[in-house]
Amino acid sequence: MQHHYADINGIRMHYVTHGAGEPIIFLHGFPEYWGAWKKELNDLGKDHYVIAPDLRGYNLTSRPQKVEDYHIKHLVEDVRALMQHLGLKKSSIVCQDWGALLGWSFLLRHPDLVTRFVTINITHPALFDRELRENPRQQLAAQYMLVFASPQAEPQLMGDDFAWAKQAVINDARAHGAILSEDDVAEWVASWRQPGAITAGLNYYRAAKMGPPDGEGHPGGSNLLEGLKPDQYVVHTPVLFIHGEQDTYLLADGQRGLKELVPNLTIRRLPDATHWVALEKPREVSQFVREFLRGQG
């Protein structure tokens, strides 16, 4: 794999490329970095040109200091500017967790730039907001978002040498089949130890005003759809939704109504996968993506 930097949209973005062929951009989540996709990049890079950035604020990409610097409009522009830097007129996108919220937001604003779209566990933002506003089960599952938005988040996540992140990501994924070497774990921890990286990741939640009702006037939802009209919510791009059915953060209720907003929809389910599907089931993810991009799934 080759490592690169691009000076785009006011930041210096680190990204990795591999292979040749039709492009696929991979967008990671929180608290991740480009290496969350390492196995998929190695596999799909055999017959595609794969690109995996460290998103704004993460790992080796620069970190603006203000919360508002992580507003969705800036994140979307980062992806568009990276494509321009790479000379890509269109690309498929594969994304998970916060990367999928960004991916959907990019797709809704720039449908002409996306060939095919793969989201893991994250539903359409309109349905995501509905669930946060109206569904008590999802509201309970999303209480962590209120913690992430609070000043207490950094000490909780960074305390005892990132014990929370190690348990929530590494240990949980390993318990569900992820094969992560000690070198892999060291790379993850090194990404968290980058000064300001955890705060930058938390600022995604803060800038998006994302979460369930907070009891202090926030009705729940997010600002991810800001500036869009309802008629822009319908997606005509082919979409693959990969669902890890044991995800306790993002409930399946959010899929209700997805077919109406995404007529060209394919769903593939992994009954024993959790939130960390790309780590737990890289072979299956690569297979699903390859078949979908070939028009077979």
Where are these regions (language model features)?
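Flexible "cap/lid" subdomain of the alpha/beta-hydrolase fold that forms the substrate-access gate
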Residues: 1, 11-13, 23, 58-94, ...
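Short acidic-hydrophobic surface loop/beta-edge motif
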Residues: 4-8
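Conserved HGGG/HGGXW glycine-rich cap/lid loop of the alpha/beta-hydrolase fold
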Residues: 16-63, 82
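Acidic beta-to-alpha connecting loop that harbors the catalytic carboxylate
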Residues: 20, 245-247, 272-274
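Hydrophobic beta-strand core positions in alpha/beta domains
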Residues: 26, 52, 241-243, 269
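Active-site helix-initiating loop/hinge in glycosyltransferases
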Residues: 29, 71, 280-281
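Conserved strand-to-helix beginnings and helix N-cap segments that scaffold or border functional pockets
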Residues: 37-38, 251-255, 279-283
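Catalytic active-site module of serine/aspartate enzymes centered on a nucleophile-bearing elbow/loop
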Residues: 263-297
